[in-house]
Amino acid sequence: FAEFNRYTNSPVANYHGQIYNLPFNMNTFNKMWGVVTPAEAKAKIEEQKAAAGITDPQNLEEQAISLVGTDIYEKLIKGYTGKQWGRPCTELPAFIIKRLPVRFTYDNNYFNALYQGIPDGGYTAMVEKMLEGIEVRLNVDYLADRENLNALADKVVYTGPVDAYFGYRLGALQYRSVRFETEVLDTDNYQGNAVVNYTDAETPYTRIIEHKHFAFGTQPKTVISREYSTEWKPGDEPYYPVNDEKNGALYAKYKALADAETKVIFGGRLGEYKYYDMDKVIEAALDVAGKELA
């Protein structure tokens, strides 16, 4: 369906005008502390971890400090994560931060995957080819007409909010939404990187995306999108779940209801109320398809 380019995700963080490499690696540690070797970086982290007295992290703040020390937490995690989730790091579970890779090498590649890239021509072109010969109905509210739509198939794949499927009968799960502010700029290169995270608490947006760098564009102008993380409310598009203890307990009840729906497959971030990266959700979809078609 598509050829892929060689794009490798290597975001950077901007903290009050200071640029740090992501994921946290030796380039980050060198900029932060002036350390040169992995042993020096590990010693600095252990020193800060010991000073904080953390042995059993109970929340995201403690988990982050135990992974990368106080300085990196304060400058590169605290403000950004607070904006992303809309609540202080002390109120978020420790496991969220485990998604952030930490490396003691001078490697700015965010992912460890052997193959990386973005479809030439973009994802829209790829999906259009995938949908050739398939009937697509747009602007259809499945939940408002599920009886008629269910009659069209033996199995239904539902990727909407799991609580909405059951009419919020057990209460509403919490989600985060995202608002994008896109602008065309009369310059050929605005920030020099596809993704720049703004990790201070004062900057209202979480990051700026400069789209041309995903495809190594050479256009005379550039398009940027500022990304704002917002609290979800009915009518907004939910982007990702709030995986804290309260919502996890409520989702477990909805999952029991979902498991009883033998004709419906619940999938994706919203259907499974799970923070999925793209590669993992595609892998999960292929696994389910393989089992269903076996």
Where do the language-model regions lie?
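A short alpha-helix-loop-beta-strand transition element characteristic
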Residues: 1-16, 72-75
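Short catalytic/ligand-binding loop motif for oxyanion handling, primarily in non-cytosolic enzymes
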Residues: 12-15, 21-22, 73, 84-89, ...
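Mid-domain catalytic core of redox enzymes
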Residues: 140-257
